[in-house]
Amino acid sequence: SPTQWLVDLHGTLLLGPMGPLVLGVPAVLFIVALVSGAVIYGPFARKAGFAKVRGGRTTRTAWLDLHNMLGAVILAWMLVVGATGLINTWGASIIRFWQMSELSTYAAQGTPPTGRTAPIDTIVDAARARYPDFQPYFVAYPGSLMAGERFHAVYLRGPDGLKEHIFQPVLIDSVTARVIGAPRPPWYISALALSQPLHFGDYGGLTLKVIWALLDLTTIAVLVSGLILTVSKGRKGPHDSLAEVAA
């Protein structure tokens, strides 16, 4: 569908598994640009006032003040979205590290594969019995990235609040449907789980999505005004541009 195509474009650039790693580069540059811009804008804000737009100046100065004003107002939001986007680009690597460092400690547990597994409903019921207030979100099958060779991993979500976005895995013996363990997710897995809905504005329903869309449009305005300033700079050097900010 067109929506899924846009999601894939945003998340992978349609490049497959390498896409998120490629996207990590502009994410880092975006954060660096925000931090350096805040450092440059700081002296001007102390002198003229926060989000000040000067009147009676050149068109380029008007664009500069618009760029600075919009960027200063939504700086914190852009940093949050940039940082969570960067975390998301590392998602597969983070999960793989978790599998090798912590899930691997359960690798030898469980019944060796016999070609027959317990019914999936029985496996899910065993996980829910461990956490009655939680709801199943997805099941990772043996041999997949988020499970082991001898066990299914049932990932549960809490009933409300932050627990709704943090997964709790329950490892179930694939043959006997016995609970092998329920390791608490480490901080970096929780950070990944929380960053995904925060990046896309999924915490507050439609209202937050509308706010996120407006902030996205404002960010586009910041980027466009920055491009206009770069193109119109002409022969001005970096020292001239800094002087124009402070003028």
Predicted region positions:
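Conserved histidines in hydrophobic membrane contexts and catalytic metal-binding motifs
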Residues: 1-247
